[in-house]
């Protein structure tokens, strides 16, 4: 592989590791000319998969488009780059497991949302607000209420108790 620093055509692999359950191979390389080290990632190239959008148009599957959307939703959130990469890998695995030549954008969006909901709730709401194209604040509120209800159920509380507690805490700070 060509060195990205001096462009010498020969490098040595000094370390190889499997990442994300073998989905990706990370290689540390060293240039034979300048001695600089750099990292490369190897993954299976996705087949010619087409995404069917809501309006019926088709476009080639683009892993990077999913990654950009997730990174945007996670902007300034405590979510690591590795966690984002893992999420994108999981979505891509789900997409490829369908073994279809065409897949709906809804399938991809839903797969991202399911994983984001568990990863970071604020990122989930951010992504949902774009993906679901909320027409008004009421629809956004419904999504937040749904998330709060799910969180309350997971913690063994009703959503009303969670909301009341949050309200009490907010008033006690004033």
UniProtKB/Swiss-Prot annotation:
Keyword hit for Nucleotide-binding: yes
A Pfam family recorded for this sequence: ATP-cone
GO biological process: one example: negative regulation of DNA-templated transcription
Source organism: Chloroflexus aggregans (strain MD-66 / DSM 9485)
Keywords, ordered alphabetically: ATP-binding, DNA-binding, Metal-binding, Nucleotide-binding, Repressor, Transcription, Transcription regulation, Zinc, Zinc-finger
Cofactor details (free text): Binds 1 zinc ion.
Acetylation found in the keyword field: no
Biased composition (Polar residues): 155-174
Gene name per UniProt: nrdR
Occurrences of domain ATP-cone (ranges): 49-139
Family the entry assigns: Belongs to the NrdR family.
ZnF unnamed span: 3-34
Co-factor(s): Zn(2+)
Superkingdom, natural source: Bacteria
InterPro entries on file: ATP-cone_dom, NrdR-like_N, RNR_NrdR-like
Cited NCBIfam families: transcriptional regulator NrdR
HAMAP family: NrdR (MF_00440)
Protein's recorded name: Transcriptional repressor NrdR
Stretch list, region Disordered: 151-174
């Amino acid at each position: 592989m060509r060195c990205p620093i001096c462009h010498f055509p020969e490098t040595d692999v000094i370390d190889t590791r499997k990442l994300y359950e073998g989905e990706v191979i990370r290689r540390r390389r060293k240039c034979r000319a300048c001695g600089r080290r750099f990292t490369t990632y190897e993954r299976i190239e996705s087949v010619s998969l087409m995404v069917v959008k809501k309006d019926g148009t088709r476009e080639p599957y683009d892993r990077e488009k999913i990654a950009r959307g997730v990174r945007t939703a996670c902007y300034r959130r405590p979510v690591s780059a590795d966690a984002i990469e893992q999420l994108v890998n999981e979505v891509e695995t789900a997409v490829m497991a369908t073994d279809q030549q065409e897949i709906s954008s809804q399938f991809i969006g839903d797969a991202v949302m399911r994983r984001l909901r568990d990863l970071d709730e604020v990122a989930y709401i951010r992504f949902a607000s774009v993906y679901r194209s909320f027409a008004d604040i009421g629809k956004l509120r419904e999504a937040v209420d749904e998330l709060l209800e799910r969180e309350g159920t997971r913690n063994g509380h009703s959503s009303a108790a969670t909301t009341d507690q949050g309200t009490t805490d907010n008033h006690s700070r004033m």
